Each structure stands twice: as C-alpha cells, then as structure tokens.
Amino acid sequence: MAQNEYAVRLEHVTKTFGTVVANKDVSLGVRRGEILALLGENGSGKTTLMNMIAGIYFPDEGEIYVGDEAVTIRSPRDALDLGIGMIHQHFKLVDVFSATENIALSMGGKDKFDLKRVHDKARAICEKYEFNLDLNQKVYEMSVSQKQTLEIVKVLYRGADILILDEPTAVLTPQETEKLFSVIRNMKADGKAVIIITHKLHEVLSISDRVAILRKGEYVGDIATKDADEAKLTEMMVGEKVELNIERPEPVDPVKRLELSHLTVRSAEGITVLDDASFTVYGGEILGIAGISGNGQKELLEAIAGLQPTESGASIEYFAPDADTPVQLVGKSPKAIREAGIH
C-alpha cells in the first residue's frame, strides 16, 4: 500500500530519557478505516511512542507523517490541529462541570462560550456514533465508562480522524468493554484510524484489524489479526515460545490460615464498599482478588491489616503455624496485626 494511504506513520523514530532508550528506530503506521493494536509488555515503549504522535513528547530522531506530509508536533494542541486525539488512562475532566461544559473547556476561541452550540454539535456526534452520554450530567455523577466516552467525544468534537486509546479497557467491566468496542467499530466504519495500546491478548484478537508489536522499545513487526493467535502474539512480544496453559496442582492437605466472615466496610461517607464478604485462605495457595478498580479490593486488604474499621458482626481469624487457637484480628491495631504475622 502506498505510504500516502496511511493516516499517520512514523519513520525511524527514536526517543531517549537520559541513558534510557524508550524507543529505538521505530517505523510503523495506521491506515484510514483501520484498528491497529499496539502490543507489548509493560515498559516496551508503547505509550511513549504514542505520546510522540499526540504531542506530549518530541522525538530525538525520525519523522512523523500525517498523510504524506512530514509534520512537527510539539504539543497536544498541534496534534489536535492535525486531527490526532489521544484518550489517556487518567481522564482530564473537571468533576463539577457537565459533559457539555467539559467539551467547551477543551476548545479555543469564542465558540466555547456558546454552550447551546457546543451541546447541539456534541449531541449530533453522540447520535452518529451511538454514544450513551447525557451531556447535561455532571462528571462526578458519571461512571468510569461514561467519563471515557466523554473524552472520546471531546476529541471527535475537535475534528480528530486519528484516535489513540491508551489501555482503554483497564478500568472497564466486560460489558462496558464490549460497548466501547462497538463504538470503536462505528468509528472505523466512518473512516477513522484507531490505535489501541494494550497488552490484553483476547481483546486484541477481538477488536483489531492488525497488530504491531514492540519489544524493549524496538518495533518487532506486525501481523494481520486474522492470522494471529495468543501463542503467536506472545512469542512476538517476548521473543520466545511461552506456555500459556499452566497446570497448577491442588495443594496437598491444605491448612487454614485466614478466615473472614461477614466482613462489611463502609466509607467515611457511609457508603457500603464491602458487603458481607466471607472466604478462607489456605497455606500453600495464592488467592487472587479480582474486580474493577474501586470495587472494595483496597478496603478489603486494609480491613485485614487493621487500617479500616469494620461493621459489627465481622470476624477475621488468623491461624498461625503451630498455634493452638486462632487470633481474632478485628479490633486489633495495625501494629498488633503485624506482630501476629500478617504483613
């Protein structure tokens, strides 16, 4: 395909921070109407590379092309003026403003003072791409997925034809992820170029048309998603074959070490953040606590460590090795809990 059919491409781009080489001689591009997944392990240089397209960093070497024109992007405003918008993991929104007000705030010139015009144009964008967003709602009332949707609407409002999403599903439920993917497919159908930074292989295979892989800051290559599977992508990421199916034998004669019963924790505002949790942890096993960030994981661990007060009726018993009776942790200080053997 001719180079001018790329919406944006990088040629021999290098970026260093002191003695650390974040990206080395990287050349890649994304086509119009294509969803490109940028894949790599943590620290492989994915976000740094995209931050150069978005105007947050400036390359030490190499060129960035939008269409067939070499461009200089020294700020996010430069990027937006070229039709490039990046949606970061941490949203840049004012909580006490409505969706419409946040969109207006991101604009320059006098148009931002005409909130009705901003609202009407934003509503048309929402209808076109089937966004579920109340433009009059305050940001602090929104779910995480609604805030993310607002960030996407903001860059589309500014005329972005190239969208970069940095780990967009990290804070979403599976249902919210599927809604986001539906929106991304709508944008692709409209001719937008979309780059998704991720390390979730099953999502890469679900949403992308092509996968580009970085390893230790260098471009390894790309592969059409239809020709890829998790084993192939993993091998390209780490440079060798990886066994994805690990057999974990059951512990032999497991011994109870920690037992939680009816654990309820409320926030300072009186909101229940942990509701009647009960489970047992055994020696010789690793117990994973899964869930979207903000669903009580932090409060659970803090309650065990004595850093969170619990509601009446809760019990946390620690069965220390060689001890005849368990130690009740509820009501004990963090120091006493550490001395009991919980770290």
Language model features with spans:
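Glycine-rich phosphate-binding loops of nucleotide-dependent enzymes
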Residues: 2-343
